[in-house]
Amino acid sequence: TPTAWQQYTDWQKEDKKIVKRINELIKSIDRDGLLEGIGKPEPLKYRKVCSRRITDEHRLTYNFDSNQNLIIYSCKFHYED
């Protein structure tokens, strides 16, 4: 999403380690599916998205669309706080 892309580009300026972690999480989603792999994946209640831990403070929220394309909703903060 545009929001997630903006957050990702912000991370590129702020913290390269976070960018590396986000990339690792995306690879895990691609390889392992929605709810398997690294980052403690979990479905979020009341929303049709899943979450993985980037850090204690930040989460990657995502899902697949009807064509099985990965959609990332956010990669900064904790469930869009």
Where are these regions (language model features)?
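PIN/NYN-family metal-dependent endoribonuclease catalytic core
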Residues: T1-T3
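Enriched for short, Lys/Arg-rich terminal
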Residues: Q6-V19, I38, S51-R59, N63-D81
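Generic hydrophobic alpha-helical segments
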Residues: Y8, L25-I26
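A short, surface-exposed loop/turn module that caps and links secondary-structure elements
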Residues: K27-R53
